[in-house]
Amino acid sequence: MHTIARALVASALGALLLAAAPSPTADLRGYSTDAAKAERDWEAKLRAVPSPDSLREYMRRLSARPHHVGSPYDKDNAEWILAKFKGFGLDARIETFDVLFPTPKERVVELVAPTKFVAKLQEPPVVGDPTSSQQAEQLPTYNAYSIDGDVTAPLVYVNYGVPADYEQLERMGISVKGAIVIARYFGSWRGIKPKVAAEHGAVGCIIYSDPREDGYAHGEVYPQGPWRPKDGVQRGSVMDMPLYPGDPLTPGIGATKDAKRLAVSEAPTITKIPVLPVSYGDAQPLLAALRGRVAPADWRGALGIIYRLGPGPARVHLRVKSDWNLKPLYDVIARIPGAVAPDEWVVRGNHHDAWVNGAEDPISGLVPLLEEARAYGQLLKQGWKPRRTIIYAAWDGEEPALLGSTEWVEAHADELAAKAVAYLNSDTNNRGYLNIGGSHSLENFINDVARDIEDPETKLTVWKRAQLRAIADATSADARQEARQRADLRIDALGSGSDFTPFLQHVGVATLNLGYGGEGGGGIYHSIYDDFKWFTTFDDTSFVYGRALAQTVGTAVLRLADAEVLPYQFTGLAETVAKYTKEVEKLAKDKQDEIRERNRELDEGLFTATADPREPDVPPARDALPPFLNFAPLDNATDALTRVAERYEKALGRAQANGGGALAKPDVQAVNAALLRSERALTTAAGLPRRPWYRHAVYAPGFYTGYGVKTLPGVREAIEQKNWSEGDAQIEAAGKALQATADVIERAAEQLEKAAP
């Protein structure tokens, strides 16, 4: 779900910079010398197993037919994956949930004035692409969880349809009240667009794919090239997932057969206005019929028209009607029991459902997971037994709303809180560079893994290639110096958009999200053209980056499962949180300065005097100056976290010295018991304001960004949204969570100091 176009993989998961301190030993963090040698032998055997030929055949099978939630092939794929897991020698089963998943019965977008035009709302098959013609099995082009509606209204173009765009429209004197808005994809997660439109009084929303973003502006369109063709449409969910993901009717609990459910009319995550997506072929006549003010330069796409804002004279009729029945989900769960610590779990997942055939999204990420499982089966036959329990999951229902992972996490929340060591996620996988997002306590760990993986194109390590890219992309001498001198690649904070969300942000499980990408590009996201033919023509055609992902994540899972001491590092976490703290303090000051300056300009009459009399802008509203915010609780907690992180590093260094014999002492199990709670301590029982499902105090999807992360979200969004009355309370809540984490790390350090005084 989270990948919108291959060209954006690097930015969606983040540019890889460099930071953090090196591991306390030259060998594996959390391992004695002898254990590290044995571990490296097992890891080498694991990395020898994944085969590009196997990956290709898995993809051919899994993407052969459309397999959306509730479809026959979705269940068939789940049963096939189950058989594969069992064939590899793993204990596996299917867990079923019943979720609300609407599918369309009626869809209409038509221009009724000043001329007539009826949108196709249909993607045509392509000659030479056999699966593109499976129309009877394909989901129509639609946005899931759009409310039913039938409206006719003037049309207004709102650019990306994010809050800043509406502020600009208001300055230009343009209202969307009572109108249907048309917004282009990108700029935010799609569900934000109808949400913000409804908040401003719109009665309907159309979302279209402009060729500026993923069409002919970038190159040849499919089938001649990889980019979105004229009639290609991006399906997708518009549920208000910043409130909560998963089944709209069972927030916070697993959607089992007997679960207590909300009525559909009570579900707050369903849109307030009807929504439909269209192609740029269907959008062009609608946009061309608009008059009024010419759109600002940065609002103009690549269609051969004058982009105007409206409202009108274009009037549009929009109708959406769906089947609102429950559909079954099939989560495929495999388990390898731990031999020493069976109640400590390392969980690995990728989803198996798609909007249509889904070769890129999600099968390119799923097939490496299957090869990892096959590799574990071979290791088991050779006598390997993991120290901890390993759980492999092929999730259903990710595309509509992270359904399968969220319902599984909610159903097993207590067990996960007690047992989960880490969750490792992937989604789509492409050619290019290793992209990493996740918990900063795992930053050093995943860097060490990346140093052991070979890039299939350059034969460098994937770590070294990413470092060199950071140097090449640096925009200043200081940035280049930092890229060369820092020890580790800095990983990105995670917002939402894939199955890591419930693990990290609801339960507080340390998380990594991994994938390759950034080379090439494409515009087939969530369309019928995301299929085996497209992928094997334009993407990782030799499947060598699929093999690299299996080697990367397989090694990471194995290393986490076998470590004597969990390989978290907290100095990187402390440094990152300190950076976030400085950011929000600066944000508060900048917001105060901005309001003070704007109010002064209003007093001076600046906006009226400088407005074009022929196209006058409305002066902005006056804001009251924000109150003083007391950041002391956050600063003090960050300082405490930094101190105990350094203490823990010293203690671990002593424990791993002289061969690491101290790691065999009984005190070490108490260390792991404490470490297991470190990410959990970063959550708060109350959760975030107006969305208590999200509990993490450091990472959350933005209320108005969707996928995009907000760090220290309670504090940051209080400032951004000018909810000053919440500011001090959120600073206090974040400070308490950070202090609780520092206390947990201090207990772990004390236990290590007992083992190695």
Region spans (language model):
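Metal-dependent peptidase/peptidase-like ectodomains
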Residues: V118, P229-V294, A341, G397-D531, ...
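A conserved hydrophobic secondary-structure block that centers on an alpha-helix together
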Residues: P154-W227, A339, D343-W345, W355, ...
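His/Asp/Glu-rich mid-to-C-terminal helical/loop segments that flank catalytic regions of hydrolases
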Residues: I391, D452, Q505, E519-K579, ...
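Second-shell loop/turn segments in exported
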Residues: D41-V49, S63-P72, T141-S146, Y157, ...
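Soluble metallo-hydrolase cores and metallopeptidase-like ectodomains found primarily
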Residues: S133-Q168, L243-E360, R374, Q378-Q382
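Alpha-helical metal-binding/catalytic segments enriched in His/Glu/Asp
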Residues: P211, V332, R348-L402, E407, ...
